[in-house]
Amino acid sequence: MIKRLIFIVFLFSLLMGQKRTPAMYWESLEMKEKVSFINGVYASGAKLKYHHKQEVKKQYNQDLSWVEPYYIERFYEIIDELRSKNAGYDVELIAKALDALYSNYDNTEIPLLEALRIVSLAQDEKTDKADLYLLKAQKRYKTY
């Protein structure tokens, strides 16, 4: 009896649960919270890159013939793409650009980090790359 009740409650919660999109979450935040979120992404990216470089240096310090592989360079490029150089410390500009991105219905399912990457590339005037990432994200996260 209890198993049936648990199953019915579980099934009911699955059917009646609302799906929150990344755009809904972003719109529910106040501007201070949006700025804090973006600062957190920037800080975690910088810390991740720093610690990764330290670990690579520790592991390959003694090997004189070691050359940094391309995938490590690409990893650092992806982390750098999350941060807009032109916007500098004006994180509110990035938050407003994310607001504009999420105002389009086609972009509501794009995860926040991908949206931040697209917006940062656009702010750095790499519009071709930003448009390509936007089209790929719209295709990957279609809204029905």
Regions found by a protein language model. Name each.
Residues 20, 52-144:
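Compact alpha-helical subdomains of small soluble proteins
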Residues 18-68:
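N-terminal secretory signal peptides
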Residues 5-7, 37-42, 94, 98:
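Generic hydrophobic secondary-structure signal
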Residues 2-17:
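Sec-dependent N-terminal signal peptides
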